[in-house]
Amino acid sequence: HVMHLGAAMQMKPWLLAVIFDLPKPQTPFAQDNLLMTTSEDLSKNVVGIETPQEHFGVMDSFSLDEQMVMLRAVLKRTPEQKEKDFEKLMRAYLKGDAAEIANLDAQITGGMLPAPLWKKMRSKLLEERNVVMAQRSLMKANEQSTFVAVGASHLAGETGLIAAFRQAGFKLTPLNMR
């Protein structure tokens, strides 16, 4: 990744960790942007499940020391490691295997962070947010036909969105991703 030093110096360590943990993009457009623009092109109403403050504020709950641990861990990873891990995640995603994605999250991110920090990160980034995302998504889904797009890590587990929708009585059908 290439970034102007002045810009990097203005960013919080957690944001730098997120940016530098990504492999080289396959396309200039992120999946979120592709889904949003496609929906807008089809004149579909696009609504965020979280506010930007909720989305980004989660990381502000981590101390500066914790953010630096995250950044150092990410910077130790080689581009080859990032690409290999990304490919594993993509294979699990394309198979529709949410449990495997959760396992890979634990291996990859959990494997590079101290256990207490990984536990806090999982709780703050996934479990707590999943509850809110599920409540808001279910409200919409009970009102009208709804397409919900979230990061794949939000799908699996007891607090994942798949479990929440099934517990609410919805029948879920995976999309054919091939």
Each PLM stretch: what is its role?
Residues 119-178:
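C-terminal soluble interaction/assembly domains
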Residues 1-121, 125:
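Structured, acidic catalytic/metal-binding patches in enzyme active sites
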